[in-house]
């Protein structure tokens, strides 16, 4: 039998959530990156119109969906992929956790992911008995590596890989004979120069791989850009042979995205206005929260893109979590993201405008009182 899995990290937040709930003005939860803004009307309408879905959905995705994904890659990422080289997934977390299994990776092989990373990468390795290796430097990737995850923009620290860094990573993965995957679900949210005006590069960018997608995949989710976390709407694209392999296993496993969700995705992918509006919401929230945190002595590190502020004041993360919980603010400790960020906390921008404003006010007021 497999070794017991670790406890779900966020379960450890219960006492701090309880402490925050005691605040006289209520708790403000900034610990989870779950969207709170409305799902675009056109997307909801597309879903509603597709509810006559009595048959099993297409595991490969409908033709309109595959075409919409390919068009989106060309338009938004500057990447050319064929409709036959894309595959819808039931959210992106499912893919992250299951990809080692889907690729047939097992004991004696390694899955590599960032040193500071969302825990699902390591969990995917654990589920198949593979070695989980947290390493950013491609030179440190072991010879038995079979899968490499690149997260750009990254969660939690908002790091962005430029073209040169992506090219180096791809070249090293190919030397090792490993599949390399870019987890790119925050690509629409670049904040600091140059990403406030330049397109964040995909791992499939022709400047990275030319026209050769061999061994390379890009994963993307509509949860954040389109407020579709409840729909479980995501996809993966790239190496056509790998996509075919994943499709075969997913057919056997019954991993099918519901037909109404596929219809909703087509609408979301073809409408850019709602994405621009959502980006502006997050920009304002980010500025509001960042200003207050810096006023209170927190240092924002990284956070050049994505939906989080990654901050530190030099104390243990749990101490900072408790301090903010006493203000009624729930945040995530750096310990959740590996062993290399014990003094950081993550604050999500996925809270209502009023909640972000209230959190900023509480942080400022407490800092002023302590001065």
Question: Which role does the model predict for each range below?
Answer:
Residues 70:
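The alpha-helix within a helix-turn-helix
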